[in-house]
C-alpha cells in the first residue's frame, strides 16, 4: 500500500527565554517557517516522470509514458539537453529504469533495470549521453531504488521472498561491491514490518502488501542516512571502502525489532498516519518534507493539498530551518545544494511546470 505523507504532529509553539522579544520556536526547536515564493519554468518534452534526481549540472528524469526513457535538463534554468534510449528490450534500449541515488559531481548517474538484472552507469561521451558501464546482478536480490557510493558500493533494500499470507516479511538493508557483477558484502535486518496477504478469487491470484516503518535512504560522501518514518528514527551509518555499514548514531526513541514486530499492521488507519519523508542529504544537512492533505471523506480521492513544508536538520538531527513552499500542490521536491535551490512539480499533472525556489540556511 502506498501511504500518503501527511504532516508532522507537533506540539504547540514554545517561547524562547523568559525575557526579551526572541523569536518563537516550536517544540522541536525550529524557528518560524520561512515562506518561499517560486519562479515557474514551462516544460514540454516529458510526460509524468516516474523518477528524477539532481546529478551535477543536470536534472535527470525517467519516464515510461514516452518513446524515450531518459531526459536531461541543464540547471538551474531547466534548459532541455536531450532525450535518450528508446523504450524496448534491445541491447541499446531500456525496458524501464529506476534511478539510483548518488552525489556524483560529474553528472554521471546509475539506472537499475530489475527485469534484466542490470545496473548501468550513464554519462557524457563524445558529446552525447551514453552508457559508460554495465554491472550484472547475479545475486538473488533485485535492485530497485538504491544509493551508489563512489561508483563502487551499492546499498539497497530487499524483502524476503515468501508465498502465502505472512504476518511479518523480513526487510534487509544490503550493501554490494560493484565490479563486473554485484557481490554481497553486508546485510542488516531493517526495523520494518511487512504484512503480506494472498488469496485466489475467480481464478485470479491477488496479493496485498502493507509495510510499517519502511526505510528511506539518502547518501552523501561516505555517510548513509536511513529514515524510519513511522517511529521517527534517523540512523546514520559510515560506509567503509569495503562496503561494511557501520552504525554511527540512532536518533529518536528506542528502536528494537521486538517493538516493531509487536505492531498490528492490519489495525493501522493509513489515511490518518502522519509521516514526513527524507528527500535529500547534503554535506551538512538532511531535508525532510511534510505534505498536509485535507481529510479524506472516503468518496473523493482528490484531496486538497493544504501545506507543503520542508524541515532541515544537521546530521546530528539538530533543527536548522523550516520552509513553507507557496506552491503547495508541487509535492515532488528535489534539492540542489550546489546552487541552493529546490525544484518542485505537481505529480498529479503532466510535467508542465517546474517551480524553482531559492533558500538560505
Where are these regions (language model features)?
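C-terminal motif of bacterial Sec signal peptides marking the signal peptidase cleavage site
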Residues: 16-18
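Beta-strand-rich domains and repeat architectures in extracellular enzymes and scaffolds
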Residues: 39-70, 285-293
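Loop/turn-rich, solvent-exposed surfaces of beta-rich toroidal or solenoidal domains
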Residues: 270-312
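Beta-propeller blade signature
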Residues: 169-181, 302-318, 356-361
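A short helix->beta-strand "capping" segment at the edge of beta-propeller domains
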Residues: 24-47, 318
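Surface-exposed loop and turn segments in beta-propeller and other repeat-based domains
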Residues: 39-41, 82-95, 132-139, 183-209, ...
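Short, conserved, GDST-rich strand-edge loop motifs in beta-rich repeat architectures
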Residues: 157-171, 288-305, 352-357
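Repeated scaffold domains used in trafficking and secretory/extracellular systems
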Residues: 46-53, 93-101, 139-150, 213-215, ...
Amino acid at each position: 500500500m502506498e501511504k500518503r505523507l501527511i504532516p508532522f504532529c507537533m506540539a504547540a509553539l514554545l517561547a524562547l527565554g523568559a525575557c526579551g522579544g526572541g523569536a518563537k520556536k516550536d517544540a522541536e526547536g525550529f524557528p518560524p517557517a520561512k515562506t518561499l515564493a517560486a519562479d515557474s519554468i514551462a516544460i514540454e518534452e516529458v510526460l509524468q516522470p516516474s523518477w528524477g534526481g539532481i546529478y551535477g549540472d543536470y536534472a535527470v528524469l525517467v519516464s515510461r509514458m514516452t518513446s524515450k526513457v531518459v531526459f536531461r535538463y541543464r540547471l538551474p534554468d531547466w534548459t532541455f539537453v536531450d532525450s535518450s534510449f528508446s523504450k524496448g528490450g534491445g541491447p541499446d534500449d531500456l525496458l524501464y529504469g529506476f534511478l539510483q541515488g548518488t552525489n556524483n559531481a560529474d553528472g554521471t548517474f546509475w539506472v537499475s533495470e530489475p527485469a534484466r538484472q542490470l545496473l548501468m552507469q550513464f554519462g557524457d561521451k563524445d558529446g552525447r549521453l551514453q552508457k559508460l558501464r554495465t554491472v550484472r546482478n547475479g545475486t538473488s536480490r533485485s535492485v530497485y531504488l538504491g544509493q551508489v557510493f563512489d561508483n563502487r558500493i551499492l546499498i539497497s533494500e530487499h524483502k524476503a521472498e515468501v508465498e502465502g499470507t505472512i504476518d511479518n516479511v523480513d526487510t534487509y538493508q544490503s550493501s554490494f561491491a560493484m565490479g563486473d557483477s554485484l557481490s554481497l558484502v553486508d546485510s542488516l535486518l531493517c526495523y520494518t514490518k511487512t504484512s503480506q496477504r494472498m488469496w485466489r478469487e475467480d481464478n485470479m491470484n491477488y496479493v496485498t502488501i502493507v509495510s510499517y516503518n519502511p526505510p528511506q535512504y539518502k547518501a552523501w560522501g561516505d555517510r548513509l542516512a536511513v529514515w524510519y518514518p513511522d517511529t521517527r528514527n534517523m540512523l546514520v551509518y559510515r560506509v567503509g571502502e569495503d562496503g561494511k555499514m557501520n552504525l554511527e548514531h540512532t536518533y529518536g526513541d528506542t528502536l528494537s525489532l521486538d517493538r516493531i514486530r509487536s505492531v498490528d499492521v492490519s489495525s493501522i488507519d493509513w489515511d490518518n498516519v502522519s509521516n514526513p519523508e527524507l528527500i535529500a542529504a547534503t554535506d551538512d544537512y538532511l531535508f525532510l518534507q511534510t505534505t498536509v492533505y485535507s481529510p479524506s471523506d472516503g468518496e473523493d480521492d482528490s484531496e486538497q493539498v493544504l501545506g507543503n513544508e520542508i524541515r532541515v536538520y544537521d546530521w546530528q538531527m539538530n533543527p536548522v530551518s523550516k520552509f513553507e513552499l507557496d506552491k503547495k500542490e508541487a509535492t515532488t521536491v528535489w534539492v540542489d545544494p550546489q546552487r541552493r535551490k529546490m525544484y518542485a512539480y505537481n505529480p498529479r499533472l503532466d510535467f508542465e511546470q517546474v517551480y524553482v525556489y531559492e533558500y538560505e540556511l
